Amino acid sequence: MKNTMKRMFCSMTVLVTAPYNEEGRKELENLFGSVAYQSWKEQGRAYREDELIQLLKATNATGLITELDQVTDSVFASVPELSFVGVCRGMPSNVDVAAASKRGIPVFYTPGRNAQAVAEMFIGNVISFLRHTSASNQWLKDGEWDSDYLQAYVKFKGNELTGKTVGMIGFGAVGQRIAKLLTAFDCKIKYYDPYIQDDHPLYEKASLKTVFSDSDIVSVHLPRTEETLGLIDRQYFDLMKESAIFVNTSRAVVVNREDLLFVLKEHKISGAILDVFYHEPPEESDYELISLPNVLATPHLAGATFEVEDHHVTILNKALKKWKGEKTLNIQTMYNKDALKTGG
């Protein structure tokens, strides 16, 4: 880590391949010296490993800010001058963190950057599902309204969100932001999260089974880990109310696909709102879910707002200022701080 800290105080170039607004880039210039901006958006895809190495070498970069590129052990080995990596994602899943830690390189990330975006889309999609907005919109466009006004009034009469019990599986930044927005609807919030030790003053901590059995809406907010793969299966779906809705905006693989397909086809629950799939773009097996009439599906859009890019700039620049200014590893958004403290 000493070499990393020493390099940090010299004027350096930061290669930025993530979308980064002009104000954020100016802050980086003031902080480090210069910025080489090569956003992946310019070519419409992430840089390949060889392209990333070439870019880092061509720009003499000693810092990297990325969003999509795979930052592998080979990248670190090829560019030993790297002093930090910033990742504009909720988890630095595209970076070989162990390889970075071994070399004393801190990896920063931006948890919660899309919390507001996902929370707003959750509210919108749930209301759309409850009020049959998508179906009624298509029905109207298809010219089906051929009787009096009561035809649609009766056919698409739905339910209100207000007063519903909403269960959260995982209660991190996104889950808590959703809960905050739901207070405007007088919803009761129950959450399951084994990593939150203390009870929340406003919301009810509950077991996984209780969240599924008591909720009108169950929403999943879990990362992909060995622990969560296939966690949500038939034993939990069978606990849900027949009128309940299942929502997944996190990762498809935390849910057993066949079990979800069964309960939807058999109308064991009211339906599902899905923004993530087992293959993206979807394959035939995914379309079996997507095409069901009681599924509201969107193409992984929950975090897709322009403001999310502003949020990750704010979060990352704040961390980098603290790291450089205070010469500290005690930064909440430094993902591998514990490994660096113990020597990798």
Swiss-Prot record:
<comment type="similarity">
    <text>Belongs to the D-isomer specific 2-hydroxyacid dehydrogenase family.</text>
</comment>
<feature type="binding site">
    <location>
        <position position="275"/>
    </location>
    <ligand>
        <name>NAD(+)</name>
    </ligand>
</feature>
<dbReference type="GO" id="GO:0006564">
    <property type="term" value="P:L-serine biosynthetic process"/>
</dbReference>
<dbReference type="InterPro" id="IPR050418">
    <property type="entry name" value="D-iso_2-hydroxyacid_DH_PdxB"/>
</dbReference>
<feature type="active site">
    <location>
        <position position="280"/>
    </location>
</feature>
<feature type="binding site">
    <location>
        <position position="193"/>
    </location>
    <ligand>
        <name>NAD(+)</name>
    </ligand>
</feature>
<protein>
    <recommendedName>
        <fullName>Putative 2-hydroxyacid dehydrogenase YoaD</fullName>
        <ecNumber>1.1.1.-</ecNumber>
    </recommendedName>
</protein>
<dbReference type="InterPro" id="IPR036291">
    <property type="entry name" value="NAD(P)-bd_dom_sf"/>
</dbReference>
<feature type="active site" description="Proton donor">
    <location>
        <position position="300"/>
    </location>
</feature>
<dbReference type="GO" id="GO:0004617">
    <property type="term" value="F:phosphoglycerate dehydrogenase activity"/>
</dbReference>
<dbReference type="InterPro" id="IPR029753">
    <property type="entry name" value="D-isomer_DH_CS"/>
</dbReference>
<dbReference type="Pfam" id="PF02826">
    <property type="entry name" value="2-Hacid_dh_C"/>
</dbReference>
<dbReference type="GO" id="GO:0051287">
    <property type="term" value="F:NAD binding"/>
</dbReference>
<feature type="active site">
    <location>
        <position position="251"/>
    </location>
</feature>
<dbReference type="InterPro" id="IPR006139">
    <property type="entry name" value="D-isomer_2_OHA_DH_cat_dom"/>
</dbReference>
<dbReference type="Pfam" id="PF00389">
    <property type="entry name" value="2-Hacid_dh"/>
</dbReference>
<dbReference type="InterPro" id="IPR006140">
    <property type="entry name" value="D-isomer_DH_NAD-bd"/>
</dbReference>
<keyword id="KW-0560">Oxidoreductase</keyword>
<keyword id="KW-0520">NAD</keyword>
